[in-house]
Amino acid sequence: MAQEVSEYLSQNPRVAAWVEALRCDGETDKHWRHRRDFLLRNAGDLAPAGGAASASTDEAADAESGTRNRQLQQLISFSMAWANHVFLGCRYPQKVMDKILSMAEGIKVTDAPTYTTRDELVAKVKKRGISSSNEGVEEPSKKRVIEGKNSSAVEQDHAKTSAKTERASAQQENSSTCIGSAIKSESGNSARSSGISSQNSSTSDGDRSVSSQSSSSVSSQVTTAGSGKASEAEAPDKHGSASFVSLLKSSVNSHMTQSTDSRQQSGSPKKSALEGSSASASQSSSEIEVPLLGSSGSSEVELPLLSSKPSSETASSGLTSKTSSEASVSSSVAKNSSSSGTSLLTPKSSSSTNTSLLTSKSTSQVAASLLASKSSSQTSGSLVSKSTSLASVSQLASKSSSQTSTSQLPSKSTSQSSESSVKFSCKLTNEDVKQKQPFFNRLYKTVAWKLVAVGGFSPNVNHGELLNAAIEALKATLDVFFVPLKELADLPQNKSSQESIVCELRCKSVYLGTGCGKSKENAKAVASREALKLFLKKKVVVKICKRKYRGSEIEDLVLLDEESRPVNLPPALKHPQELL
């Protein structure tokens, strides 16, 4: 065939000159020989005539020069496409391929190279079978991607710092709520003590010092109890409260009997009686109220003590009855706030009893003692009206303060749990899948061409470098995370695997694969190999799947092939929503 073409060109020098002008610069003799054959077979009327050209033919050629030039350029393009397909393995749209193959019929190319297409490569891999991930850990090649390591290390540092700032902000919120509740309780106590001090203008200097000391001790105890136990406030059970009331009953009875005996036997002046009664009252109050304020459910214990309605009823009943000493003891055991009212509003009460009861720490007791100091010039009926009105006022104030304290305390205890649950509350939707899928469709094509360039998927290929290069070609980054195997609670552990490292690969917040090895490079190589196996299928799909993370199941975006089902996925090394 080549001899026939050379003989034809030697006989027609004009055709030979015309064809030689169509040769490209740098085109090899082998390529040009076959492409010249293609041009001559399909030139037709485009080639000049073999003999001497006449004037008439030249004029006709000039008239049709525009059409001839277009046809000539099309013929040259077809010849170049055919040569690229034969010698370089290029492929074109189906219409173009059919056209150039039909034009090249009869041309025999004996020394053309052979190329493997992507579809043929995938078919070969399927026939050969894909090795499982449970095989021995293979040694990676010497090439390492330094940029990937640096970027993953920087991202891990950013994740750690963000977690620390979130914890610090949560602690600041808890401390601020504790301080706010303590300030509210102190303001309530100060308001009550200021109202009492306005009525207590006629009392002695000793009584004022005792009342100021009691109010300051109450505020300090409230602040310590609020700040120490605010986050762990729990309601005490009924059995514990019953045993506590029995202890109070015994302590109050003992102190009341001692005080009555001392008043009967002592003939000392009023000043010594005042000092003794104040000391005994301070001891009884410290024994009664310190455990109440130190308990975890302080707000719920104070609620029945300060704002209970039976306090006013027992106070009014104590006025009408003359057996007031026994009734005052029993009522003070049931409700601490009513003890002073029943004992102070009784007729013929001594001044020592009034001053001793001034040292109690509840506001209703102090108000009742002030009423008792004024009872010398008033009747028992007027005392009943004043005591009931003051008791109702103290009940309203105590109710408002106790309600605010009880509403604050459970909110503090649940603040940490609500923050931890809201922290990762956003759920993945199909919109997230639709946003990620186009990128991985492009990545599938890029990885396929990279595999064709290196001769297909094989153990000799640096899988990590190939995957990273394909992702960087699409202007994205490969996220790499490392965790020691012993820190994973969702994997079985034995002595041989204690020192292993687990690697997880992600891209665009989508999970690609997990690998385990004795070093970070080894683990990354295994994870990259598992990720590349997905791209050997016909199609890759982004799906929302369940994965384990620290003992619980979470949702994650996972890259899978079209046929596989998400069963027994490896546990997540980090929470996916931390990385979004």
Swiss-Prot record:
The keyword Ribonucleoprotein does not apply. Residues 185-228, 274-313, 321-356 have a biased composition (Low complexity). Ubiquitously expressed. The keyword DNA-binding does not apply. The modification Phosphothreonine is found at residue 346. One of its GO terms (molecular function) is RNA binding. Induction: Up-regulated during replicative senescence, in response to DNA-damaging drugs, telomere unprotection and oncogenic Ras-induced stress. Induced by proteasomal inhibitor MG132. Up-regulated at G1 and G2 stages of cell cycle. Residues 462-537 form the DRBM domain. GO terms for cellular component: granular component; nucleolus; nucleoplasm. Its main location: nucleus. It is found in: Nucleus, Nucleoplasm. Pfam families: XTBD. The modification Phosphoserine is found at residues 131, 241, 389. There is a cross-link at residue 184 (Glycyl lysine isopeptide (Lys-Gly) (interchain with G-Cter in SUMO1)). Residues 19-133 form the XRN2-binding (XTBD) domain. May be ubiquitinated. InterPro entries: dsRBD_dom, XTBD. Keywords: Acetylation, Isopeptide bond, Nucleus, Phosphoprotein, RNA-binding, Ubl conjugation. Belongs to the CARF family. PANTHER family: CDKN2A-INTERACTING PROTEIN, NF-KAPPA-B-REPRESSING FACTOR-RELATED. This is CDKN2A-interacting protein.
